[in-house]
Amino acid sequence: MSLSFVPHFFQQGSNSYKPLLKHSHHQEVTMEVGGNEFTEITLRPLDLSDIDAFMVWATDDKVARFCTWDAYTSKADALDFIKNKVIPHPWFRAICLNGQPIGAISVTRNIGNDECRGELGYALGYKYWGKGIATKAVKLVANTIFSEWPHLERLEALVLVENVGSQRVLEKAGFQREGVLRKYITLKGKTRDLMMFSLVSTDPQS
């Protein structure tokens, strides 16, 4: 499985969002992960005590491959990121398997005339790809974000065209494929095409 192109939440120095009060609610869903083993996928705020779990996926080049950020090599840099970017972020959650963080997901809001739109980003530890976990996490966000942010009418996700796995995740979560944005971003030294996906508040929940 491939992961989403993550627009902002791992990007060092990004400050495109307008801070809001942080939400502390805890979302849960029970799902089957292989065979008959039932596990809980939950979303919760990520904090400094999660640094060791964070480093597992944030230092992995396979995870960072499709994202705007390079794999972390310094625990100090990762702690600084969590303290100064994650904790103040208006909607950033750890994706947890049985309470243990294995990835992260965020919604970054726009401001001004664009406040009706938000941008989804996510990353998941490589060993958990292909198990339906990312799809479950995206569904959890999609089923609650519009009620949490009444101004939000559209949730977008941008994915590299070669990132077929993440495109499947979004489609399974109810997002619509809108088209290709050609030569849309310079990513890791190369100009890349992105696929735009969207979910609007009036779409039926999946």
For the regions a language model picked out, list residue spans one by one.
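Acyl-donor (CoA/ACP) binding surface of acyl/acetyltransferases
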Residues: 5-57, 95-206
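A short helix-loop-beta-strand connector motif used in the catalytic cores of GNAT acetyltransferases and
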Residues: 82-94, 103
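An amphipathic alpha-helix signature
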Residues: 48-55, 75, 79, 83
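Generic structural signal for alpha-helix termini and adjacent loop/cap motifs
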Residues: 61, 85, 147-148
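Conserved GNAT-fold acetyl-CoA-binding loop/helix
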Residues: 62-82
